[in-house]
């Protein structure tokens, strides 16, 4: 396709109201970027026609043991979607960022704040 489309859900925590991905009605010929607050959404909801998923919510664990393990991760999937390039069960790439904020406690240990720049390149034959 010729287009890059950006889609997102309103509240990824309320699957009763938002349990249908906005990407389902989009063309598989377009490159679709799905924005979601939590990476769990990309696993709990069929995100058909998504080519790239961008998520946050985990803060990279916020407080980790030397960046290797986070005792508390706000995800049903534990360490699986902690931070970085991940793939959901449908093998769709998902970038989970640490973000720049914190949750209830304004502290970070071995989970630095980050702003991620993503550069897309057209595939050539």
Give names to the regions the model predicted.
Residues 1-36, 42-44, 48, 105-109:
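Binuclear metal-dependent hydrolase catalytic cores centered on His/Asp/Glu-rich metal-binding motifs
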Residues 1-8, 27-31, 87-94, 120-125:
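Beta-strand-turn-beta hairpins that frame and shape the catalytic cleft
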Residues 39-117:
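Conserved beta-sheet core of the metallophosphoesterase superfamily
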């Amino acid at each position: 396709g010729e287009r890059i489309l950006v889609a997102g859900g309103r509240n990824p925590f309320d699957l009763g109201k938002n349990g249908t991905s906005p990407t389902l009605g989009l063309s598989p010929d377009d490159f679709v970027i799905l924005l979601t607050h939590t990476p769990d959404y990309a696993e709990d909801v069929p995100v058909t026609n998504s080519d790239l998923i961008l998520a946050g919510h985990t803060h990279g664990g916020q407080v980790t043991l030397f960046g290797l393990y986070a005792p508390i991760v706000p995800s049903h999937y534990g360490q699986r979607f902690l931070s970085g390039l991940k793939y959901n069960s449908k093998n769709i790439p998902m970038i989970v960022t640490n973000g720049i904020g914190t949750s209830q406690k304004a502290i970070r240990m071995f989970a630095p704040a980050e702003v991620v720049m993503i550069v897309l390149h057209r595939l050539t034959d």
